[in-house]
């Protein structure tokens, strides 16, 4: 008996498989087209340099917050010492007056003003001042002195509390700026980690060459012929500071560092001047107001401070022949570079 079942259609299975394969290929092609291309070495370097510049800005804000915290801490310590000494003096005055009162009591003649003064907690004395003023006691001078001490002590305590509040705010700001710096540096490191090992090695070699060139250059010898007059120091103080800076060529940039083995930009200049027994402010923005401003590059002399960018977040020394000596940024070392590598704003002669 002949079978009436329909014959198998192998072609249908094949078509289904081919269709699925084609769909998958289209999907993969679409995903590839939509995926963002991996940034190349040069693009990553540009982004990293930008992040390093932003980190340096945040570093100067951190330095300012740290300086403010240090100043406020000293003020708080001083006020707390004054309060402690004032309390001791007040206690001594009270004890002396108490001794007089005891002697009068034993002799049967306690002065009414002392009786009123000693009748309750001495801290409530100010509320009774008007009554004491009317007594005209022979002890009024002692009581007035205690009253004056109490008022002074209350004022000192108020000032100390105000400074403690300011100190807490400064510590909060310091923490915020520290997180800002670390965040920028971490972001830069993530970008560097996205490169291939070969690309990272190439960037490292570029930085090594820049460091090597900047640590072996001599601005006074870079120009053939007649030496630049600007290589003569601006003053003996500037000469001593600049010489101290030269002695640290090759030391690494570390944000927030003030030497002697690592520096940020303003830490480098402030440390160098300190070696010349000249105290200048800690931050680049404050250093910009530490001396006479010079707006023309042609008027700069060796040892002058030079400032860059609109917000003045970078500072270094003028070295002569269009070169500066500075601590540039993360990954770099104290070195010479062209003054034209950054937007120059003005110099300052200390």
Report the location of each language-model feature.
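Amphipathic alpha-helical segments with strong coiled-coil propensity
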Residues: 49-56, 63-70, 74-171
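Peptidoglycan cell-wall recognition and remodeling modules
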Residues: 225-350
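Extracytoplasmic/secreted proteins, especially bacterial periplasmic and envelope-associated proteins
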Residues: 50, 57, 78, 92, ...
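Short, conserved glycine- and acidic-residue-centered signature motifs
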Residues: 44, 139-142, 146, 261, ...
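Short hydrophobic/aromatic segments of transmembrane alpha-helices and their interfaces
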Residues: 16-18, 106-109, 136, 157, ...
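Short N-terminal segments immediately surrounding and downstream of signal-peptide cleavage
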Residues: 38-52
């Amino acid at each position: 008996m002949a079978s009436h079942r329909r014959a198998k259609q192998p072609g249908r299975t094949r078509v289904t498989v081919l269709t699925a394969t084609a769909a998958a290929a289209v999907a993969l092609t679409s995903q590839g087209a939509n995926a963002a291309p991996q940034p190349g070495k040069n693009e990553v370097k540009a982004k990293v340099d930008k992040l390093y510049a932003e980190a340096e800005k945040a570093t100067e804000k951190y330095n300012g917050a740290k300086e403010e915290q240090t100043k406020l801490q000293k003020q708080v310590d001083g006020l707390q010492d004054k309060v402690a000494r004032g309390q001791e003096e007040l206690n001594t005055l009270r004890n002396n007056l108490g001794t007089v009162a005891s002697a009068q009591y034993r002799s049967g003649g306690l002065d009414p003003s002392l009786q009123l003064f000693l009748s309750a907690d001495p801290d409530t004395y100010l509320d009774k001042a008007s009554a004491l003023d009317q007594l005209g006691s022979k002890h009024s001078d002692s009581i007035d002195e205690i009253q004056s001490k109490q008022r002074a002590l209350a004022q000192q305590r108020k000032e100390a509390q105000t400074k403690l509040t300011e100190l807490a705010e400064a510590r909060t700001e310091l923490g915020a700026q520290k997180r800002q710096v670390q965040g920028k540096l971490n972001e830069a490191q993530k970008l560097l980690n996205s490169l291939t090992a070969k690309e990272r090695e190439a960037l490292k070699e570029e930085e090594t060459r820049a460091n090597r060139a900047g640590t072996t250059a001599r601005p006074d010898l870079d120009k053939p012929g007649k030496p630049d007059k600007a290589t003569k120091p601006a003053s003996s103080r500037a000469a001593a500071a600049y010489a101290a800076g030269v002695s640290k060529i090759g030391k690494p940039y570390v944000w927030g560092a003030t030497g002697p083995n690592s520096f940020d930009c303003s830490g480098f200049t402030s440390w160098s001047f300190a070696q010349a027994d000249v105290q200048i402010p800690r931050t680049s923005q404050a250093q910009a107001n530490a001396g006479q401003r010079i707006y023309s590059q042609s008027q700069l002399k060796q040892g002058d401070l030079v400032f860059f960018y609109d917000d003045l977040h970078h500072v270094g020394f003028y070295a002569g022949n269009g070169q500066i000596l500075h601590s540039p940024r993360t990954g770099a070392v104290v070195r010479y570079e062209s003054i034209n590598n950054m937007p120059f704003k003005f110099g300052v002669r200390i």
